Amino acid sequence: MDGVLADFGSGLAKVSEEVRRKYMDRFDEIPGLFSLMEPMQGAIEAMHRIQKDGRFDLYILSTAPWKNPSAWSDKLLWVQKHLDDVFHKRIIITHCKNLLKGDYLVDDRGKNGTSEFEGEWIRFGSSEFPDWESVLKYLQVR
């Protein structure tokens, strides 16, 4: 979710310097951080376009840090704030993304089972898929 739908850096920018120093090299453990993030450019519009297309059964698949219990609820609250009622019931939080079935997985990192996912991994932020517009163009011809 973060790095694909939610802009991690935007949340981090809203946290005090003192908190950033305390959590240096483990920013994802900052309580409340995930609820502070702004949407990635084009992400909300892309989610709605893919949903309206009707060809894809769309879910939000994410991982939450084990040492940050608020991240689990923060991610749900983020979806409720930025997306419609459909999506808050379509969040799956797991550390084993490869256990889920699907044709496509849009993710920015090959961790937590992403690189072993059975379907096609669309690596968000890569040279091939630098933004949501490139992802939408790719999915339109599938």
Can you annotate each of these PLM segments?
Residues 88-116:
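Conserved Lys-Pro-Asp/Glu-containing loop-to-beta segment of HAD-superfamily phosphomonoesterases
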Residues 104, 110-142:
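Asp-based, Mg2+/Mn2+-dependent phosphohydrolase catalytic module
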Residues 37-38, 43-73, 79:
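Substrate-recognition element of Asp-dependent hydrolases with the DxDx(T/V) motif
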Residues 6-9, 58-60, 67-71, 99-101, ...:
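Short catalytic/ligand-binding loop motif for oxyanion handling, primarily in non-cytosolic enzymes
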Residues 1, 62-64, 108-110:
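Short, well-ordered beta-to-alpha junction loops that form the rim of enzyme active sites
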